[in-house]
Structures are given as structure tokens and as C-alpha cells.
């Protein structure tokens, strides 16, 4: 049975929350690997989350985009006010 998009989104937010705790952003390839997704699917979800304001894309010196969780995204994940 295919997973719901909601489950996938929360799995991605969880991956980004762990990276946030360590103080760094993740490239799409690492997000895809950690969330057990193919890279095209991960890119589609990251674009959707970026447009929703849940993640922030940052360019690196190697021109790869890395993503980090915004406060809004963290609040969606924990269901309240994140500090």
C-alpha cells in the first residue's frame, strides 16, 4: 500500500529536525536517503515544503542547494510553538 503524502512530509520534517539539532542543513541526496525516497520525489517534496515556508533553501559554495527547517516547519512538526 502506498504511503500517504502526509506521512512522507512528516518523515522529511523529522529528518530536517534532526539536522537542525546538529546545526546544519542537508542536501537533497541526504534527505532522500534518510527519508527512504528517490531523489526526484525528494526534490518534489522539498519544493512543495519550500513554497509552504516549512523549509529554507541555501546555496553552498559547490552550488548545491541545502535545506534546513524553518521555525514554521518545526512548529508544524511538534504541533505548537517552537522556540
Q: Model segments located where?
A:
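Short, Lys/Arg-rich nucleic-acid/phosphate-binding segment
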Residues: 59-66
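Short acidic, hydrophobic short linear motifs in intrinsically disordered regions
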Residues: 22-34
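Short, hydrophobic-biased segments on the C-terminal half of alpha helices
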Residues: 46-47
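Short, amphipathic alpha-helical interaction segments positioned at domain boundaries
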Residues: 72-83
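Short alpha-helical segments that sit at the start of domains
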Residues: 1-15
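Glycine-centered, phosphate/nucleic-acid-interacting loop/turn motifs that mediate DNA/RNA or nucleotide
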Residues: 53
Amino acid at each position: 500500500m502506498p504511503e500517504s503524502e502526509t506521512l512522507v512530509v512528516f518523515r522529511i520534517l523529522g529528518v530536517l529536525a534532526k539536522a537542525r539539532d546538529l546545526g546544519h542543513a542537508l542536501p537533497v541526496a541526504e534527505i532522500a536517503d534518510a527519508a527512504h525516497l528517490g531523489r526526484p520525489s525528494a526534490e518534489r517534496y522539498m519544493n512543495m515544503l519550500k513554497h509552504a515556508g516549512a523549509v529554507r533553501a541555501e546555496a553552498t559554495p559547490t552550488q548545491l542547494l541545502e535545506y534546513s527547517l524553518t521555525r514554521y516547519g518545526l512548529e508544524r512538526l511538534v504541533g505548537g510553538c517552537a522556540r
